[in-house]
Amino acid sequence: MSPSKKILVLLLFPILLVSSHPIPAEDPAKQCNLSEDDLTKLKAAISSASSAKAANEDILPSTTLAACPMLKNFTEMLKTVATDMEVLKTQGVSNMEVQLLRESFEEKLNDLAKNKDIFERQANQDTSKAEGEMVEKINKLQLEMAKLQEEIEEQTKQMYVDMIEYIFERLKMNDTEAIDSYAQIVMKTKMHELIMKLKTDRLVLWEMVKYVEGKKNKWVGRKVLNTILDQVNKLKLYKPEEVEIGKNSLVVVWCWKFNSETVYGTTDEDQKSFHLAKLFFPKEKGCKECADVKSRTMCNNDYPKVMVKAFG
């Protein structure tokens, strides 16, 4: 090879290397950088969440979110926290319990907003180092927020469990005056869980439907009726203990329906009842004494007997 060709190959070699092994593109996350205004908005949003106020619009501009994609779900996370804080603020087993719980989370959120490691910059830092640290700060912020969100959700869930237990115990003592505020909340939000608890004790379930009837709210009445029937429909007929729960629950429903103003004329629910009567009382069709259903009846009417006699 002539000297001139050797020189040409040597000149082309670096170009070929670059073409076959291109320089990797810079990680987009490393380009993430937040302005002082962005940091201020984040702090304000966290403070709002601590007061149970969710931001109605995106916290950060689209350009910032494009550069920092890990922050895209931050608005939704804060909205969830704000909603959970609102639940803690307005509902609960006792005002003192909820107040202490809310104050605890409010303090944690405010501490997060004041976190210097996240929200304060170091002076005279070069750009690349500042961007790298910003990614670390955002990751830390997301992690802290996620932990707090999970903790709030767990506490809120436990609060509902306590409320359901409270309603169950008050109904057992026939103390319905004490459960008004709790029942209103639980019936709107946790009806299924409440009835799951009640249906294991037919006496308490009977007290519950009498309580509901006394409120004369047709929407709530129908909701309770459907929840009971739907749960009975899910019971396993090959399990004797579940058959017992189903039979007792149906007799309670039939006792309730006889003179009810709240669930009168619920045709769809009647069809469900007819079907369930066939499943749970197959031996009672055409019965004279109807001993099985009679032994479960806590009311002074014969409607449960009529039901199994006709549809069992």
From Swiss-Prot:
UniProt keyword GTP-binding, yes or no: no
Disruption phenotype: (Microbial infection) RNAi-mediated knockdown results in reduced replication of duck Tembusu virus in salivary gland after an infectious blood meal. Reduced release of duck Tembusu virus in saliva. Up-regulation of antimicrobial peptides in response to duck Tembusu virus infection.
Keywords carried by this UniProt record: Coiled coil, Signal
Induction comment from the UniProt entry of this chain: Blood feeding does not affect expression levels. (Microbial infection) Up-regulated in salivary glands following duck Tembusu virus infection.
Tagged with keyword Coiled coil: yes
Signal peptide positions on this chain: 1-20
Organism domain of life: Eukaryota
Annotated tissue distribution: Female salivary gland (at protein level). Low-level expression in ovary.
Coiled-coil residue windows: 95-158
Family: Belongs to the salivary protein SG34 family.
Role of this protein: Possible serine protease. (Microbial infection) Modulates replication of duck Tembusu virus in salivary glands and virus release into the saliva, probably via the regulation of antimicrobial peptides expression in response to virus infection.
Protein name stated in the entry: Salivary protein SG34
Native source species: Aedes aegypti
